[in-house]
Structure formats: structure tokens, C-alpha cells
């Protein structure tokens, strides 16, 4: 679907919400990209920022799920020594990877050219740097060799920069700070295979938030406690995995 040239910021916003309701997330991405580029150096509102995140999260989410399914079928076919099918599956996987790369490149360009430079508040800086880390992490999930190494390094840089600002400017119970700790710890566990570091990061974020629970505002209570639950779920899973590995060793 070609976008009309002269859409206003309000029209882009309305159409993005419409596309979200219709679950047409690729178009939602286009409307939000157009909104960002059209607004130049002026900052996004919290609503606009969240819509941009939702749009890309849905598009990348279905592609990541597709990649995981295709990869597991590829392993099964290799196990069966079915060479003809393996060739077809590999080719199909590379098409999905090409789409993943394009989506990541799209949001990373928007973040670097528009959103990160224009962010003034600590909260929005952390939000965008976390997002940058997330999309480099999604690249690291399927890239191999040097490309994987570079994607992992870029993920680390973005998450570290976000963490520095989050610790200095956001409360331990702030949902964006908690979400960053959640994703950063997943990066340590899944991409760097550093399970102890992943556990200590998740545990620290959880405990710091628990200590300040009584100071939490109504508006973020639900978001924060949901992320805290996810941190605790990961900790439970990771520590039992580590215990199993130690038992096997």
C-alpha cells in the first residue's frame, strides 16, 4: 500500500492506530516511520513512542517466530539426512533472515537518525537506547560469524548506554528501567551464554525494585509488577537449567 505524500502528523497517528486495530502491522510501521521522519527533530509523545514500539515489535515478533520454526524443521530434516528438503528449507530460512535484517535496519536507522539525537528526557533516552539494543540483539539471534559478533557488540554498547542513564535517572521500579534489565539479562543468557551474569543482573533488578515497591505510583504499578514477575520467572528457569548442567557435569 503506497502512502499518501501529504499526511499530517495527526493523520499518521490516526492511521497507525487504525492499522493496529486491523492488525496490519507492516502498514502501522510505515505510518509511524512517516510520522517520525515528518516530525524531524521534534520529540515523540509517549503515545507515539509506544505505538512505534508496538508496530515494530509485532512485525519482528512474527518473523522471529517464523525463523525459529523454520530452523527447527531444518534441524529435523538434517537429522533425517533428507538433503533435497534441507536445501529448500535453508533457502526459505535465508529469505526470512533477509526480511529480519531489513526490519532491524529500518528501525535502527530511525533510532540513530531521528529519535536518539532528539531525545532530551532521561526516560526517552533509555527507551530508545534499549530499543536499539533490542534490535541488534534480534540480529545477533540469527547472524553467524563476524556479523553475529558485531551485532552482539552493538547490542552491548546500546544496553550499557541505556543502563548508565537508567541507573542515574530512573527509579528501580520504573517499567522502562525494569524492561531494560529484563532484556539485558536475556542478552547475557541467550547471546553471550553468560548465565551467571544474566542471573545476577535479573536478581539485582528484582531486589532493588522490591525494596522500593511502596513508593511506586499507581500508573506504572501494573507494568512494573508484570516485568518483575518475568524477571523472577527467568531467574527460576535459568537457575534450574544451571543446576541441571552442574548435575550432568
From Swiss-Prot:
Superkingdom per UniProt: Eukaryota
Recorded GO CC terms: cytoplasm
Pfam families, per the entry: 14-3-3
InterPro entries referenced in this protein's UniProt entry, alphabetically: 14-3-3, 14-3-3_CS, 14-3-3_dom_sf, 14-3-3_domain
PROSITE patterns in alphabetical order: 1433_1 (PS00796), 1433_2 (PS00797)
Signal peptide feature range: none
GO biological process annotation, one example: signal transduction
Assembly behavior: Homodimer.
Family (UniProt): Belongs to the 14-3-3 family.
Name of the protein: 14-3-3 protein 1
Organism: Solanum lycopersicum (Tomato)
Upper taxonomic lineage: Eukaryota, Viridiplantae, Streptophyta, Embryophyta, Tracheophyta
Recorded name of the encoding gene: TFT1
Amino acid at each position: 500500500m503506497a502512502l499518501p505524500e501529504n499526511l499530517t502528523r495527526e493523520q499518521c497517528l490516526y492511521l497507525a492506530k487504525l492499522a493496529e486495530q486491523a492488525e496490519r502491522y507492516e502498514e502501522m510501521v510505515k505510518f509511524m516511520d512517516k510520522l517520525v521522519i515528518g516530525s524531524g527533530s521534534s520529540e515523540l509523545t509517549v503515545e507515539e513512542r509506544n505505538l512505534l514500539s508496538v508496530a515494530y515489535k509485532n512485525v519482528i515478533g512474527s518473523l522471529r517466530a517464523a525463523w525459529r520454526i523454520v530452523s527447527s524443521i531444518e534441524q529435523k530434516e538434517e537429522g533425517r539426512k533428507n538433503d533435497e528438503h534441507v536445501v529448500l528449507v535453508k533457502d526459505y530460512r535465508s529469505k526470512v533472515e533477509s526480511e529480519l535484517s531489513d526490519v532491524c535496519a529500518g528501525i535502527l536507522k530511525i533510532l540513530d537518525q531521528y529519535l536518539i539525537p532528539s531525545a532530551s528526557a532521561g526516560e526517552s533516552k533509555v527507551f530508545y537506547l534499549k530499543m536499539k539494543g533490542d534490535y541488534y540483539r534480534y540480529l545477533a539471534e540469527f547472524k553467524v560469524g563476524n556479523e553475529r559478533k558485531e551485532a552482539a557488540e552493538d547490542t552491548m554498547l546500546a544496553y550499557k548506554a541505556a543502563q548508565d542513564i537508567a541507573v542515574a535517572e530512573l527509579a528501580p521500579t520504573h517499567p522502562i528501567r525494569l524492561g531494560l534489565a529484563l532484556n539485558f539479562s536475556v542478552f547475557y543468557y541467550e547471546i553471550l551464554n553468560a548465565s551467571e551474569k544474566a542471573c545476577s543482573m535479573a536478581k539485582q533488578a528484582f531486589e532493588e525494585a522490591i525494596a522500593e515497591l511502596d513508593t511506586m505510583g499507581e500508573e506504572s504499578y501494573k507494568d512494573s509488577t508484570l516485568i518483575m514477575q518475568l524477571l523472577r520467572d527467568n531467574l527460576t528457569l535459568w537457575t534450574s537449567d544451571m543446576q541441571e548442567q552442574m548435575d550432568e557435569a
